[in-house]
Structure formats: structure tokens, C-alpha cells
């Protein structure tokens, strides 16, 4: 990669931060430095929506195997922890995060997409967890999120076989939210909604507190939003 080009590119529109994995010659494989830059890009914005995409014909090949090949055990653990921090940053971001997946998503690329709020694929997208073929597995939170998203049976099938699934199969198993020619349009669709409400919905959906605590928080936030939008609600009622 040329020294003057970052592996992560940021472009801020009015309501959407576009974060591009920008290493197309390596199918956007991620080094430790790129992971750190990605974490900062996703966390360091007040835009209500973050759109995560890959440059070139792939979404993301996951971890850079040139890096992994040189790691000893402790360094490999640190690299896995780094990837987990990035996935957690995506999941915990105040912004709604949309992963636009065009072309192959492999290994860590799938794991980062799993942390997004919406995974939107083009018809050309494909997905695989091929680590098992190298004697590895997805350690950027994949063993936690994959069964949560698609169910234990589908998750075990993908992770134990390393097989590749196309966009339609990914949609059927719930791995992606939609299949469309223009995933960016979905990010823009979300950004048309009220920013505070987007943050509130994400926070409530991601809340893992006991049910009674979640319900109390839900009512408190709902009350605040009703007060804030009272005029708009009245106008809609009277129209």
C-alpha cells in the first residue's frame, strides 16, 4: 500500500459518515493499525448514521494473513483483542451503523459486519468463515455474534464447514437485513429519520439489562421524545 494512503478513508456527509476500508489490492484485509483507525472512525463522529463499506471488488477479507503468520501466541491474543475492540466499538457506537457489503466478506470481515446494526448486501456479496481451513476460527467476536444473529445451527454450519454462501442464502438465514443494488441508499434512508430517535432505538435494542430495567428505561425515553416532538405529533394528528 502506498505510504501516503491510509487503509481507512472517511468522508462526512450531512447526516452520514462514510467509512471505507481502503486497501483494495489486498481485498481490504486489516492490519493492527487499520483496526485502530477503523475504531476511531466509527467512534469519533456525531453523525447519526455511519456507513461502512469496502473499496474495490471486496468488502473485507478479514485479518491480514501476512500479519497473522508472524504472530506468536501472546501477540495473536492481542491481535484478537484488538479486533474485538473494533467490533464492540461498532456495536456500541451511538450512531446507527450500516455495513454495505458488495463482493466477498470473509472471516473478520463477516465479524465486523455482524457488529453493525444493519447488514445490507448487493446481489454480488458472498460470505464465509474460512478460518477452519487454516486451523483457525473467527476471534473478533464471531463465536458470540454469529449464533446470536443466525442461530446456533446455521452458525455452526458456517464456522465448521468454512463454506461460502451467496447474498440470497445470507438473507434467508438472517445474516443480512436486505439485498439491494444500492446499500448506501439504506444508510440515507435511516439518516432521514430523527437523530435522537435513532440513537434511542439503538440503545434500547442493544440494552442487555434485566427486562424490568429495560422497560423502565424505555418508558423514560419515550416520555422525553413525546415532549420534544409534541408539536410535530399534533400537526400529524390534525393533518
Predicted features by range, described:
Residues 2-13, 162, 166-167, 172, ...:
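C-terminal alpha-helix plus adjacent terminal tail
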Residues 2, 8, 91-195:
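Crotonase-fold acyl-CoA enzyme core
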Residues 54-89, 105:
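Glycine- (often His-adjacent) and acidic-residue-rich active-site loop
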Residues 52, 65, 76, 83, ...:
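A general structural signal for well-ordered alpha-helical segments in protein cores
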Residues 37-44, 89, 185-190:
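CheY-like receiver
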Residues 1-55:
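Conserved CoA-thioester-binding segment of acyl-CoA-metabolizing enzymes
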Amino acid at each position: 500500500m502506498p505510504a501516503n494512503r491510509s487503509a481507512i478513508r472517511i468522508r462526512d456527509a450531512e447526516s452520514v459518515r462514510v467509512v471505507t476500508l481502503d486497501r483494495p489490492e489486498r481485498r481490504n484485509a486489516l492490519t493492527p493499525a487499520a483496526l485502530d483507525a477503523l475504531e476511531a472512525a466509527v467512534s469519533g463522529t456525531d453523525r447519526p448514521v455511519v456507513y461502512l463499506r469496502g473499496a474495490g471488488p471486496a468488502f473485507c477479507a478479514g485479518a491480514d494473513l501476512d500479519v497473522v503468520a508472524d504472530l506468536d501466541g501472546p501477540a495473536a491474543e492481542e491481535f484478537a483483542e484488538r479486533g474485538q475492540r473494533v467490533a464492540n466499538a461498532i456495536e456500541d457506537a451511538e450512531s446507527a451503523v450500516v455495513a454495505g457489503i458488495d463482493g466477498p466478506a470473509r472471516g473478520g470481515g463477516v465479524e465486523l459486519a455482524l457488529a453493525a446494526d444493519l447488514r445490507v448486501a448487493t446481489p454480488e456479496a458472498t460470505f464465509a468463515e474460512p478460518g477452519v481451513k487454516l486451523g483457525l476460527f473467527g476471534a473478533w467476536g464471531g463465536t458470540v455474534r454469529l449464533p446470536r444473529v443466525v442461530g446456533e445451527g446455521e452458525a455452526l454450519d458456517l464456522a465448521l464447514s468454512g463454506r461460502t454462501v451467496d447474498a440470497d442464502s445470507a438473507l434467508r438465514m438472517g445474516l443480512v437485513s436486505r439485498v439491494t443494488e444500492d446499500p448506501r441508499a439504506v444508510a440515507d434512508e435511516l439518516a432521514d429519520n430523527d437523530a435522537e430517535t435513532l440513537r434511542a432505538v439503538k440503545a434500547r435494542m442493544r440494552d442487555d439489562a434485566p427486562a424490568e430495567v429495560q422497560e423502565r428505561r424505555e418508558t423514560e425515553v419515550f416520555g422525553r421524545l413525546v415532549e420534544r416532538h409534541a408539536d410535530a405529533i399534533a400537526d400529524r394528528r390534525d393533518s
